[in-house]
């Protein structure tokens, strides 16, 4: 076993060796290096063919038509294109947008920007388990709600929303439905032929492909229209201009192909490892799982260890790569807004650790992690006066702390 151990797959994944090998054939003079938009010679045709193959591989994983796949620089851009693009195109029909407080910042900040432009956004609160109450969602839909944006799997707590039911509510209200599937694609069965999803954001690096490339699914029937946010040569049917990065797109396609082939065996393996981790940690006193365990990604475990500071716990776990909060926001010392939205107090939100498992995670690594965690929590609690008070039976919520 090699240290440090990587248990932060929700932040990014290593590129699969098979993907890296394939990408190498699309870079140098000996490879397929042409511009897919060069229609007048073989170099361009070969590059275009490679892009077409990748487009099909991505569509195959999600039950879509390859003509519904638009390449972007990543899921953040896909979220921006979907939300701004739909809002701007359909604004004559209404200016109300519906989303949830636990969405990724790429969705929330895009909605904030639209608010500055005069759109009205409703931010739903999830239930304590992280799931959206469908009745509350339905009640929040209005005749002028042109767009709803709800993520499939949450990046921090791994909770899976019922996008089938939410999609049907949106369809009945003639509301465009965007799903951020960055964390779920390739980990959960998604068949867009059976879902009323109009727009879906995807990433490559969350599924063992390269960073810097992603895709947006844009439904053709019933047709969804977008206003572009990047203008230029009219690539990607005018929705996203810019020369296509063939090597990255080929890498993403190969990563999605591998995921489709291996999903049936890989997800039960990860679930067994995740449950092993959970069973090893749940006996530690005052530990709480964040988010529903029933409706959750098999690879995610988010636990709060009461009376332990999350940051100090991470420092004590130098040999294990985990995160508190999401990678995009974990540089700030604010408690996770996702956990706060579930109703956790600051202390519990601050003491949370997210473990996310992946393709290279082994049983040996999980057992090592359990032992290290137990020791670290015990050691840090031994230093905590709050833990002593709790053990003495003092209710810490009743104490009036005075500033001095």
Curated annotation (Swiss-Prot):
Active site, UniProt feature:
328 (cysteine persulfide intermediate)
By its UniProt entry, which InterPro entries does this protein fall under? Aminotrans_V_dom, Aminotrans_V_PyrdxlP_BS, Cys_deSase_IscS, Cysteine_dSase, PyrdxlP-dep_Trfase, PyrdxlP-dep_Trfase_major, PyrdxlP-dep_Trfase_small
Q: Where does pyridoxal 5'-phosphate bind?
A: 75-76, 155, 183, 203-205, 243
Gene3D superfamilies cross-referenced by the UniProt entry:
Aspartate Aminotransferase, domain 1, Type I PLP-dependent aspartate aminotransferase-like (Major domain)
Annotated Gene Ontology cellular component terms: L-cysteine desulfurase complex
Q: What domain of life? A: Bacteria
Keyword terms = 2Fe-2S, Cytoplasm, Iron, Iron-sulfur, Metal-binding, Pyridoxal phosphate, Transferase
Per its record, the protein catalyses: (sulfur carrier)-H + L-cysteine = (sulfur carrier)-SH + L-alanine
Q: Where in the cell is it found?
A: Cytoplasm
Q: How does it assemble?
A: Homodimer. Forms a heterotetramer with IscU, interacts with other sulfur acceptors.
Report the protein's function.
Master enzyme that delivers sulfur to a number of partners involved in Fe-S cluster assembly, tRNA modification or cofactor biosynthesis. Catalyzes the removal of elemental sulfur atoms from cysteine to produce alanine. Functions as a sulfur delivery protein for Fe-S cluster synthesis onto IscU, an Fe-S scaffold assembly protein, as well as other S acceptor proteins.
Please state which protein family the record places this protein in. Belongs to the class-V pyridoxal-phosphate-dependent aminotransferase family. NifS/IscS subfamily.
UniProt cross-references to NCBIfam families, sorted A to Z: IscS, PRK02948.1, PRK14012.1
What protein am I looking at? Answer: Cysteine desulfurase IscS
Name its species.
Haemophilus influenzae (strain PittEE)
């Amino acid at each position: 076993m090699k240290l440090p151990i990587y248990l932060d797959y929700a932040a990014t994944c290593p590129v699969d060796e098979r993907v890296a090998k394939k990408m190498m054939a699309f870079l140098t003079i000996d490879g397929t290096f042409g511009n897919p938009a060069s229609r007048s010679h073989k170099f361009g045709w070969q590059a275009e063919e490679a892009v077409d193959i990748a487009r099909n591989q991505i569509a195959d994983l999600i039950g879509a038509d390859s003509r519904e796949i638009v390449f972007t620089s990543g899921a953040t851009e896909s979220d921006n294109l979907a939300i701004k693009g739909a809002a701007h195109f359909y604004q004559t029909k209404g200016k109300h947008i519906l989303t949830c407080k636990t969405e990724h910042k790429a969705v929330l900040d895009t909605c904030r920007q639209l608010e500055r432009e005069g759109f009205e956004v409703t931010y739903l609160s999830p239930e304590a388990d992280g799931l959206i109450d469908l009745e509350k969602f339905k009640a929040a839909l209005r005749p002028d709600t042109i767009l709803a944006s709800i993520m499939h799997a949450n990046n921090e707590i791994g909770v899976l929303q019922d996008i089938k039911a939410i999609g049907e509510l949106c369809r009945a209200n003639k509301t465009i439905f965007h799903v951020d599937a960055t964390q779920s694609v390739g980990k959960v069965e998604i068949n867009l032929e059976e879902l009323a999803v109009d727009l879906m954001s995807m990433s490559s690096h969350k599924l063992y492909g390269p960073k810097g490339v992603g895709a947006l699914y844009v439904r053709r029937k019933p047709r969804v229209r977008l206003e572009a946010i990047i203008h230029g040569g009219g690539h990607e049917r005018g929705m996203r201009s810019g020369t296509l990065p063939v090597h990255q797109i080929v890498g993403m396609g190969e990563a999605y192909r591998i995921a489709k082939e291996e999903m049936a065996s890989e997800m039960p393996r990860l679930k067994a490892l995740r449950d092993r981790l959970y069973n090893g940690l749940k006996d530690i006193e005052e530990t709480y799982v964040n988010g529903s365990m029933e409706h959750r990604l098999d690879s995610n475990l988010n636990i709060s260890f009461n009376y332990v500071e999350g940051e100090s716990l991470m420092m004590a776990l130098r040999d294990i790569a985990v995160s508190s909060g999401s990678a995009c926001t974990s540089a700030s010392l604010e408690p996770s807004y996702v956990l706060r939205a579930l109703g956790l107090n600051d202390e519990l939100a601050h003491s949370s650790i997210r473990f996310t498992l992946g393709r290279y995670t082994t049983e040996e690594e999980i057992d090592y992690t359990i032992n290290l965690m137990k020791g670290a929590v015990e050691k840090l609690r031994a230093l905590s006066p709050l833990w002593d008070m709790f053990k003495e039976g003092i209710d810490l919520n009743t104490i009036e702390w005075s500033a001095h």
